[in-house]
């Protein structure tokens, strides 16, 4: 148990333009009002008399918070770590890191920044040089380097210019705070008391100009810029460095982290993911790793728990053979990474090292991550962690608050690979910000992206908040889910009225949840996983099954929307896999049009109830064939929407967007398939069977046969039979099944109650169904069978 030794320094007084600290406080001084430094003009040369407010529950009041050790250095490493670091310096995997540190320290600079005509003169090369010199002193007692580091930092601070209109300028401001904290801690005994106070002033004055408006902590703890470096790395580092001289900084930063960051991370890390997706997810995950490393080096390991180490698996499983990830939320990777270059998992090297995970470490090495950030890679990365490739199970379930299943047929990493990758998402919580309205979404890749998300995050018509962004890109209409259109429904984003796409509502009007209390008490819950299973082999499963209820993602226009996915590894070189999607949608008004969506890059071809989607060019050569079994032929409308001038259409109005440059890896999906029933009804069933293959004219798709009984609907494809309950409920009733054909079929029946089920007609065949899986499977030749729930234990 951590002992709380937080020191309370309630007052600072301004003397000779510098902040001095008072250890003894009178009762009257303790009652001084909080002074808001942000109300003053923004000027780094002005020193403010900051009176810190009393800690509240949001800042960890009454929590047992760990405190920094009484020694220097203590930020990122301690004296006891130096022998191991010296051994690491000689490791054959570390020469790039050490060389970069040495080269940075040797940079010819006195720290002074150019000011001629500049509004913003941040210089990361000088930052790196200052930190490298400070490290040379703390690590090797190089006195000359230490003195040069401090002198250069003083010059840097005096000549720094900040353009407060620069986008995301808080990231630059925070980086300077970090450098000040590092020099303060690593060169502590070279700095006089007066100079220490100057550095503290500088860090506080910079801190008040962050978006979190230090010490207000104006932003949230779950999502948004407030969860990035500002608090997690920059102000926390400042607090650790100056704890003995001004503990209020640490108390405030650490208090918010332990009160709000920690429970939120434990909540979503349980699902082995970060909710901000394929770009912002790993970007923000790295800041949580900084918190982990700061505390670990102070002697407090794994403050977020071991689940943090599993987060990179979300991106490992969503990686396509072309080196990219399935798109998840706002994605900037596809806009700025050239086609053909492997996308990286930010933080994989640190996470793989810290949690001793060979699979994650292999990702980092394959992505050539180690050595680019010489100093921090040297401090945080363990080159002795082994690597492992291609041994993970092909299916992985990511539980609530995500509720997603990723299924693969292999781990191929070439664009010509035969590996199929699919994602099936229920989506239990929507955290807003960069997350999309995509509950129920699916994506498929085989020799090219075949079923994908649509839209462009940033482009010539704008970025976050543009018309394209709020009316199309973040909306359900841009995903492979279901639309239920109430013509009178209103949609808004932060109070801004939007086009009616018929999809899901922005939770809480798109406002970001500040903390767990808001997340759990407001309407951020979008779904519930009802069942999930894969098997029979756990490493190479033949089937992967996921089912959920999605009514919470929609307005009251929907009574129920249950979606079931079954991914089949067919082990067939011509048609390697299939994805079956079964939907039961119950709307409150029979006239609300229901539309099943599939987005693709090239124009689809529709022949009766069969749609073909190909992906050619750029080295791709894949094809998807979708057979629609429900709605039935007489009640079926299939149409394609898209093409030039109609790429991102909502109810006939296009919301255009264009990438900034041609050298990108954007999928560029400008077509979609819409499947709807012709007749109005409250309850509609949808059953779509997608199979993938090479895009050769001679390559024929498998025969797809519909199966329907009074209670079940399903499909026979290849040697597989898959059945779903038509009413969407779990059943304990007996099932009659007639199998015809000249082969042995692998049967999967979903929506069955847990317990033992006997297959009459197959000698001694009893299937055990586990609670939460609600699926039974067996193999059987042609014949008549009755499956009965047994009372035997």
Regions found by a protein language model. Name each.
Residues 1-30:
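Bacterial Sec-dependent N-terminal signal peptides
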Residues 27-96:
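Mature N-terminal, pre-catalytic/accessory segment of carbohydrate-active enzymes
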Residues 74-82, 94-319, 324:
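Aromatic-lined, polymer-binding surfaces characteristic
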Residues 242, 282-451, 678-685, 697-777, ...:
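Carbohydrate-active enzyme catalytic cores, enriched for enzymes
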Residues 328-365, 477-484, 489-519, 613-649:
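Glycine-rich (often Gly-Gly/Gly-Pro-rich) flexible segments and glycine-rich loop motifs
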Residues 369-611, 615, 680-695:
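Catalytic and substrate-binding regions of extracellular carbohydrate-active enzymes
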Residues 536-539, 549-554, 566-793:
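Terminal accessory/anchoring regions of large secretory-pathway or extracellular enzymes
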């Amino acid at each position: 148990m951590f002992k709380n030794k937080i020191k309370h320094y309630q007052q600072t007084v301004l003397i000779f333009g510098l902040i001095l600290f008072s250890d003894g406080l009178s009762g009257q001084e303790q009652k001084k009002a909080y002074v808001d430094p942000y109300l003053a003009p923004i000027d780094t040369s002005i020193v403010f008399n900051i009176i810190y407010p009393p800690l509240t529950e949001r800042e960890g009041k009454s929590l047992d918070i760990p405190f920094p050790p009484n020694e220097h250095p203590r930020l990122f490493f301690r004296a006891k770590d130096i022998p191991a670091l010296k051994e690491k310096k000689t490791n054959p995997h570390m020469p790039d890191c050490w060389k970069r540190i040495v080269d940075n320290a040797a940079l010819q600079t006195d720290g002074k920044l150019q000011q001629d005509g500049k509004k913003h003169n941040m210089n990361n090369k000088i930052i790196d040089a200052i930190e490298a010199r400070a490290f040379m002193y703390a690590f090797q007692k190089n006195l000359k380097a230490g003195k040069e580091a401090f002198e250069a930092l003083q010059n840097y601070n005096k000549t720094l210019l900040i353009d407060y209109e620069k986008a995301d300028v808080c990231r630059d401001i925070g980086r300077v705070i970090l450098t000040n904290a590092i020099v303060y801690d690593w060169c502590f005994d070279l700095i006089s008391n007066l100079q220490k106070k100057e550095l503290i002033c500088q860090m506080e004055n910079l801190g008040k100009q962050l978006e979190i408006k230090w010490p207000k902590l104006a932003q949230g703890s779950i999502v948004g810029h407030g969860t990035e470096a500002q608090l997690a790395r920059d102000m926390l580092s400042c607090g650790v460095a100056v704890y003995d001289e001004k503990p209020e900084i640490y108390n405030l930063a650490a208090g918010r982290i332990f009160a709000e960051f920690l429970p939120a991370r434990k909540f979503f890390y349980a699902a082995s993911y970060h909710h901000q997706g394929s770009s912002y997810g790993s970007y923000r995950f790295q800041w949580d790793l900084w918190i982990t490393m700061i505390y670990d080096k102070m002697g407090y390991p794994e403050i977020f728990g071991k689940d943090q180490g599993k987060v990179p698996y979300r991106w490992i499983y969503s990686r396509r053979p072309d080196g990219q990830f399935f798109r998840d939320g706002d994605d900037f990777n596809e806009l700025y990474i050239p086609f053909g270059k492997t996308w990286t998992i930010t933080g994989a090297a640190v996470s793989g090292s810290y949690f001793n995970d060979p699979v994650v470490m292999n990702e980092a090495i394959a992505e050539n991550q180690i050595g680019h950030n010489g100093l921090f890679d040297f401090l945080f990365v363990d080159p002795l962690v082994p690597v492992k490739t291609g041994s993970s199970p092909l299916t992985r379930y990511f539980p609530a608050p995500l509720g997603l299943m990723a299924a693969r047929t292999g781990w191929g990493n070439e664009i010509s690979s035969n590996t199929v990758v699919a994602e099936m998402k229920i989506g239990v919580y929507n955290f807003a910000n960069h997350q999309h309205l995509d509950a129920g979404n699916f994506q498929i890749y085989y020799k090219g992206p075949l079923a994908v998300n649509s839209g462009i995050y940033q482009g010539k018509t704008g970025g976050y908040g543009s018309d394209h962004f709020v009316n199309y890109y973040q909306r359900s209409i841009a995903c492979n889910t279901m639309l239920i259109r109430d013509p009178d429904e209103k949609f808004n984003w932060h109070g801004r009225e939007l086009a009616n796409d018929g999809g899901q509502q922005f939770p809480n009007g798109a406002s970001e949840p500040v903390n767990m209390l808001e997340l759990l008490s407001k309407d951020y819950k979008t779904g519930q996983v009802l069942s999930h299973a894969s098997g029979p082999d756990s490493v190479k499963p033949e089937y992967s099954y996921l089912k959920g209820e999605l009514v919470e993602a929609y307005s009251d226009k929907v009574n129920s929307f249950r979606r079931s996915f079954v991914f089949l590894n067919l082990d067939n070189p011509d048609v390697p896999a299939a994805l079956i999607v079964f939907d039961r949608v119950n709307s409150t008004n029979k006239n609300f049009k229901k539309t099943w969506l599939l987005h693709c890059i090239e124009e689809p071809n529709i022949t009766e109830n069969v749609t073909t989607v190909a992906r050619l060019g750029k080295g791709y050569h894949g094809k998807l064939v979708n057979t629609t079994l429900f709605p039935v032929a007489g009640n079926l409308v299939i149409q394609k929407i898209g093409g030039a001038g109609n790429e991102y259409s909502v109810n006939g109005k296009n919301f255009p967007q264009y990438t900034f440059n041609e050298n990108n890896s954007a999928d560029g999906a400008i077509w979609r398939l819409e499947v709807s029933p012709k007749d109005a009804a409250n309850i509609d069933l949808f059953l779509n069977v997608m199979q993938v293959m090479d895009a050769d004219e001679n390559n024929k798709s498998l025969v797809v046969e519909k199966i329907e009984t009074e209670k079940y609907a399903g499909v026979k494809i290849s040697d597989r039979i898959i059945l779903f309950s038509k009413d969407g409920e779990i059943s304990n009733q007996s099932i009659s099944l007639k199998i015809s054909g000249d082969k042995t079929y692998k049967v999967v029946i979903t929506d069955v109650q847990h317990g033992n089920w006997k297959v009459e007609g197959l000698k001694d065949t009893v299937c055990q169904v586990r609670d939460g899986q609600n699926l039974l499977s067996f193999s059987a030749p042609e014949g008549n069978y009755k499956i009965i729930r047994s009372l035997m234990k």
